[in-house]
Amino acid sequence: MPDNHGPWGLRWRAKPSFILTTVAMGLFTDLVLYGILLPALPFTMRNRFDIPNAEIQHYTSAFLATYAGASVFFSVPAGWAASKLGSRQLFLGGLMFLVVATAIFAFSTSLVLLVVSRLLQGMSTAVVWTAGLDMVQDTVEPSQVGETIGTIFATISVGELAAPVLGGVLYERGGISAVFAVSAVLLAIDLALRALVIDKKTAVKYESPRLIRFPVERNMSDDHVASAPTVMEAQESVHEGTRLLPQVDDDGDHYKIDRELGSIVRAIPLLYCFREPRLHLAMLLSFVQALFIGTFDATVPTVAESLFHFSSLQVGLVFIALMLPYFALGRLSGQAIDRFGTKAAATSGYAFLVPCLMLLGLPEKNLVPKEANVALFCTILALNGIGLAVVTSPGYVEAIDVTTKYQVANPGHFGENGPYAQLFGFSSLYFFTGLAVGPLLGGFLRANFGNAVMGAVYAAISGVTAIVSFLFVGVRRFGPGLV
């Protein structure tokens, strides 16, 4: 048993800055090991498995959808397990799936094993994102959730940005073995951080609550940390009315559970929260965002190869145009949500994406010389990247807001570990469903009708989402018991 002082290095291992760094590194590694394969995947299909050129788009979309489908299937179980076992243990365990998946992909000689590797990586992603975001929610103040998620997403977007480029360089220079070697180094660093981190729920058992700081540390000075509220103080402030953005109403009675619950809802208490339509809309935002991301992941490599005859390295470089806005605008987008609310961010982001998605059909018309056409393609991707950066956080923040209201109105209903692991499990379910549908729908539309029709369909989806966001996101206007 640990002594009264707790585990070795408790203070720094339980610091918010270290917890958030560990979570960010876990998500970063997950995205890198996903993105590092994107530019190499079409070439791997052809060179290792002799897939005909005409079928490469189909196989590429199918493998990406397999990964996302596994994430869909395991998201809710991961949320349930995190709420029962604790997020830190699950966060560490999820890495094992990723290690095995990476090794199988590097050395597999059959399509069946390649499918297995995608399934395992999808399982790992479901666990890592669900448990990781739950640890973030436990660590930061409610009023800082939007900025924190935006900052983390901006940080890990470096992985999204660098991975395709790195994958293209490594595959072109050293083949799949070079890709695996770099992946192994990242996994080793990630494993060390996950083994060391101590989450807040564990840390508070060993020390006085006043020594366990709750909010995000904006810098590392002791004076600043000393002025921060503690876990207990922050929890008290929540019960006194602290709210996540967007702030919508104070009707606590609406969120009060006043009926006998069935066995399924008692086992998964978050299910009751879906009586609130805003939670469904929050999940819809996550689905549509992922739908677009999955489509770009599946179609950008094949468009770049077929239209411009790019190598794997050049395909990786093209992704910079799409991912750079994430890095540049992620934190600003999160701050804007904390200040102006989810309605403004979701509405403006999806409205902005409408014309950007419509432009996707221009490059294939060859209206300008090849060099200018490449620049046009990259510019269109960058514009879409700006829109995607804006719509990254609203769904998460909206869902947290609704769930927090239920938690405050019903103390103890969600158990010792709270509702957020289950929430992020369901959020991941919707997100990865979009990530699974995106490659299939986008690949089908592009292969059968071309980029122009694909862009028009997605622009229509984005327009409808913008209208729904303007009318209903952040505002409780319909549903049972509303006034």
UniProtKB/Swiss-Prot annotation:
GO terms for cellular component: membrane. It is found in: Membrane. CDD domains: MFS_MdtG_SLC18_like. Glycans are attached at residue 219. The chain crosses the membrane at residues 18-38, 62-82, 96-116, 149-169, 178-198, 281-301, 310-330, 344-364, 374-394, 424-444, 453-473. It comes from the Eukaryota. Pfam families: MFS_1. The keyword Transmembrane helix applies. One of its GO terms (molecular function) is transmembrane transporter activity. Its main location: membrane. Keywords: Glycoprotein, Membrane, Transmembrane, Transmembrane helix, Transport. It is a multi-pass membrane protein. The keyword Oxidoreductase does not apply. Belongs to the major facilitator superfamily. TCR/Tet family. MFS-type transporter; part of the gene cluster that mediates the biosynthesis of pyrrolopyrazines, secondary metabolites showing insecticidal activity. Probably involved in the secretion of peramine and other pyrrolopyrazines. This is MFS-type transporter ppzB. The gene is ppzB.
